[in-house]
């Protein structure tokens, strides 16, 4: 199959979150299975691009769309070719892909509408780059209009509509939906018949993500549990009715991790290598991390790590609420991240009171992130919801049993230490509350202090799990095949939908 992977970000070129990591890892994993994959993304300012431009295609101004160019970049090695959408007036800006220091870019609807429209055009016989995709794989709201545009192209082609690509949309985080005033719809070339409740309309506005969910031939999300959760009012963010109506086309596929980059036996960012069979180097990593952060070298204290956004969604308020107890019980804390200023301040205040046993670094440092994963005894990740998550997989790969909530990808990738079959890899909260967090931390402390053999078994279980991308890639290829063989999909009628008060969000 020929697959176009359309995305707004891809590490290391540009990354604001997990989508950037997936865009870097999944396409080459699919290509390794024998499929032809191209990756489409905008040409942002100052991207650290390495490769050779081997093709150039002009896209003249047409209707709402400004003139642009498609540049093909071959990066060599295992990397898939890039198609960069160059339109300096839309993409050559500072800040993140979605916002400047002053806030969201006011023309984001046009910026990402163009990206989705070009993605859809590449799925037609009139592809502007001389290469036509069989599947257009959209990711989150910035490319989610592509399935709708493909529907318009297919309908316009009449009997020749079967030559138009099928589509998939992957939901990486349903909280971000690309919601814009409805007057953008006409400017983006969306036909009126697609603007009712059974189409892209969402509480009187245009929802790019809802359009993708309604018109895609296949819908995926980043873990099986999250696929179930987003069909509930609690985590559906106003789209649970749409997702329940389309449940037959919805599938959860657990993300993988880059097992070359996140591998303690060959990680150049940690002071000593180690493996499931030779764990000695982990003690050296713990000692080095303590030295770096100024923590006491106390052999009786268990070191808990945390790397992530400092928000209530990530359960940071529970970490703050349980920190004093954790320290009293013989723990230490090494925290790296940024987010809510109030939570940052609360963590810093705790660290100031306990400088020998708690350290907080506000910001991000890749080397320190690896050091925390390698040097900690356990990793805290008590998210209230987590579509997939990566750090819990990194932690298991590094022999650092995580403490997690039973949600999303955390539930799918961590087995509790009390597993009757002896396959435990971490500690799963028994509920979602401060008390449940404190109890799980207490279980981890108790096992680490009293049962070293059981703890080593927990470490080895996690380190021996395969979190690579191959299994995920196979599942996506199977889903592509199902989308190609599926009969024409039609949006659900209004009677099939049920909305709650939405939490629309246009940006990450």
Swiss-Prot record:
EC number annotated for this UniProt entry: 2.4.1.21
Residues that bind ADP-alpha-D-glucose: 15
Keywords per UniProt: Glycogen biosynthesis, Glycosyltransferase, Transferase
Phylogenetic lineage: Bacteria, Pseudomonadati, Pseudomonadota, Betaproteobacteria, Burkholderiales
Official protein name in the record: Glycogen synthase
GO biological process: glycogen biosynthetic process
Pathway: Glycan biosynthesis; glycogen biosynthesis
Family (UniProt): Belongs to the glycosyltransferase 1 family. Bacterial/plant glycogen synthase subfamily.
One Pfam family linked to the record: Glyco_transf_5
Span list, region Disordered: 483-508
Job of this protein: Synthesizes alpha-1,4-glucan chains using ADP-glucose.
Superkingdom to which the source organism belongs: Bacteria
UniProt cross-references to NCBIfam families, sorted A to Z: glgA, PRK00654.1-2
Reactions catalysed according to its record: [(1->4)-alpha-D-glucosyl](n) + ADP-alpha-D-glucose = [(1->4)-alpha-D-glucosyl](n+1) + ADP + H(+)
Gene3D superfamilies membership: Glycogen Phosphorylase B
GO molecular function term, any single one: alpha-1,4-glucan glucosyltransferase (ADP-glucose donor) activity
């Amino acid at each position: 199959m020929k697959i176009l992977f359309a995305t707004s970000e891809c590490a290391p070129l540009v990354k604001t979150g997990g989508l950037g990591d997936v865009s870097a890892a999944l396409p080459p994993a699919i290509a390794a299975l024998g499929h032809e994959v191209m990756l489409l993304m905008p040409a942002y300012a100052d991207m650290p691009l390495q490769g050779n431009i081997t093709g150039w295609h002009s896209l003249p101004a047409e209707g709402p769309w400004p003139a642009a160019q498609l540049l093909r970049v071959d990066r060599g090695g295992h990397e898939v070719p890039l198609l960069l959408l160059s339109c300096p007036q839309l993409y050559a800006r500072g800040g993140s892909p979605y916002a400047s220091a002053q806030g969201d870019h006011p023309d984001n609807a046009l910026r990402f509408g163009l990206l989705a429209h070009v993605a859809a055009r590449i799925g037609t016989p009139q592809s502007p780059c001389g290469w036509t995709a069989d599947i257009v794989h959209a990711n989150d709201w910035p490319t989610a209009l592509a399935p709708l545009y493909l529907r318009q192209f297919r309908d316009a082609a009449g009997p020749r509509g079967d030559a138009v690509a099928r589509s998939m949309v992957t939901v990486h985080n349903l909280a971000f939906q690309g919601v814009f005033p409805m007057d953008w719809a006409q400017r983006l070339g969306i036909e009126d018949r697609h603007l009712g409740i059974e189409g892209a309309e969402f509480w009187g506005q245009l929802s790019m993500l809802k359009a993708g969910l309604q018109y895609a031939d296949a819908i995926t999300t980043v873990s099986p549990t999250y696929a179930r959760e987003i069909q509930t009012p609690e985590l559906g963010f106003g789209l649970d009715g749409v997702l329940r109506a389309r449940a037959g086309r919805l599938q959860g596929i657990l993300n993988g991790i880059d097992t070359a980059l996140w591998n303690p036996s060959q990680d150049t960012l940690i002071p000593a290598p180690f493996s499931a069979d030779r764990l000695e180097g982990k003690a050296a990593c713990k000692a080095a991390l303590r030295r770096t952060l100024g923590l006491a070298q106390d052999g009786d204290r268990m070191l808990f790590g945390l790397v992530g956004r400092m928000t209530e969604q990530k359960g940071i308020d529970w970490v703050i609420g349980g920190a004093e107890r954790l320290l009293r019980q013989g723990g230490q804390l090494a925290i790296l991240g940024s987010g809510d200023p109030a939570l940052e301040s609360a963590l810093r205040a705790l660290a100031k009171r306990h400088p020998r046993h708690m350290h907080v670094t506000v910001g991000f440092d890749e080397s320190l992130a690896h050091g925390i994963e390698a040097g900690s005894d356990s990793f805290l990740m008590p998210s209230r919801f987590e579509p997939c998550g990566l750090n819990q997989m990194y932690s298991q790969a590094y022999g650092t049993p995580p403490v997690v909530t039973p949600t999303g990808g955390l539930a799918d990738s961590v087995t509790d230490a009390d597993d009757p079959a002896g396959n435990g890899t971490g500690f799963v909260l028994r509920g979602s509350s401060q008390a449940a967090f404190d109890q799980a931390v207490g279980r981890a402390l108790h096992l680490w202090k009293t049962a070293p053999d059981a703890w080593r078994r927990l470490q080895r279980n996690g380190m021996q799990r395969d979190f690579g991308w191959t299994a995920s890639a196979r599942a996506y290829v199977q889903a592509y095949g199902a989308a190609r063989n599926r009969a024409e999909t039609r949006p659900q009628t209004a009677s099939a939908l049920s909305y709650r008060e939405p939490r629309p969000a246009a940006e990450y």
